[in-house]
Amino acid sequence: MGENLAGRAAVVTGGASGIGEACAVRLAADGAAVVVADLNAGAAAAVAGRIGGRAVEVDLAADFDAAALADQADILVNCAGLQHVAPVHEFPPEMFRLILAVMLEAPFRLARAALPHMYEQGFGRIVNISSVHGLRASPFKSAYVAAKHGLEGLSKVIALEGGGRGVTSNTICPAYVRTPLVEKQIADQARIHGISEDRVVEEIMLTEPAIKRLIEPSEVPELVAYLCSAPASFANGSSYVLDGGWSAR
């Protein structure tokens, strides 16, 4: 850790908890001025206060002001997400729309707002927190898998458009991370399958990775910090997988 991001402004969505919180803390440790953007205003304020950042309450599913949030960002980390577990024939259409709005449309709108400033200065870093489910599918997660696959495509298009102008765009694709979102999934999967939560972790979440554990939130931001750094200027348009060997199958 150091001050290699001093003078840079970073926006982290979903920054009040889980991976987003860990990313906000890590980027601040590298000297960035971090905006912690989250639906939970109190939690965002707590994180921002701890790292000397600024909290912004935002509902990414609504008609939020993307320019006000991101048009001066040098670094954009799209991390906000939610999950709903149900078979396709029972999946509520309104929940499908909500998940795509937060996890695909909002990253598009924020990138669209941030890119003119990034292009003007010849520097920008967009890191999209995707998932192994941006590369693979699992039953009962149609909206989440669709949103993450879409985010992979969006990130690559931005990479192609921005690469020659000093702007890079990449995704990070973790397996299951020990976050509130995953804890809720464990409970939902236990209900759907009629098994204990411990069995969900062992028999559903950890069957594919060769490394049999959940990822800790603090592990993901180390890669985020690298991708935001000057030495990562040639890292562009890629999907960086942190899945313990899942996608090696």
What is each PLM-predicted segment?
Residues 108, 115, 211-242, 247:
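C-terminal substrate-recognition "lid" of short-chain dehydrogenase/reductases
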Residues 80-84, 245:
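Conserved NAD(P)H cofactor-binding loop of Rossmann-fold oxidoreductase domains
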Residues 163, 168, 235-237:
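Short, small/polar-rich loop/turn modules that mediate ligand/substrate recognition or access, typified
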Residues 87-88, 92-100, 126, 205:
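Substrate-binding pocket helix/loop in short-chain dehydrogenase/reductase
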Residues 131:
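Residue(s) in the substrate-gating loop at a strand-loop-helix junction
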Residues 89, 136-143, 164-165, 212, ...:
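Active-site loop immediately N-terminal to the catalytic Tyr-X3-Lys motif
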Residues 111, 147, 155:
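Active-site helix of classical SDR
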